[in-house]
């Protein structure tokens, strides 16, 4: 019985490269001269520090641009609240989302069931397995999910016939 898996994974090496490139740009840009701005990668999060709100927004724009150049979707980033640091500085934690949560998995399964295609979807840990009798139905599910915005970046792997 043909099947495939739906996952949400991020290449941490690409994120590390994008963070390093963004940090280089921030250190060299004229509008950041004389101010303390930084980007740090910590395990499953990125910590952004800006001299003020304007500078923090500019740091975020630089980071998003570098991620886009490295083909990493900004949907994998979960921006936390801005919190004050020392003086006028502002800090923000950005969590890196990996895997499909139970709620998102249920939402994906519901979308697939509402499509009336003859396939079954089941949640397995941090991924969703879709199986059906025809490969054409599975390809229709892939097209359906690519057209929908579920809030996270989806990859389709392990297509078996």
From Swiss-Prot:
Gene Ontology molecular function terms on file: nucleotide binding
Coiled coil: none
CDD domains for the chain: YajQ_like
Keywords on record: Nucleotide-binding
GO CC terms, sorted: cytosol
Protein family (similarity comment): Belongs to the YajQ family.
Function as written in the Swiss-Prot or TrEMBL entry: Nucleotide-binding protein.
Protein name in the entry: Nucleotide-binding protein Pcar_0033
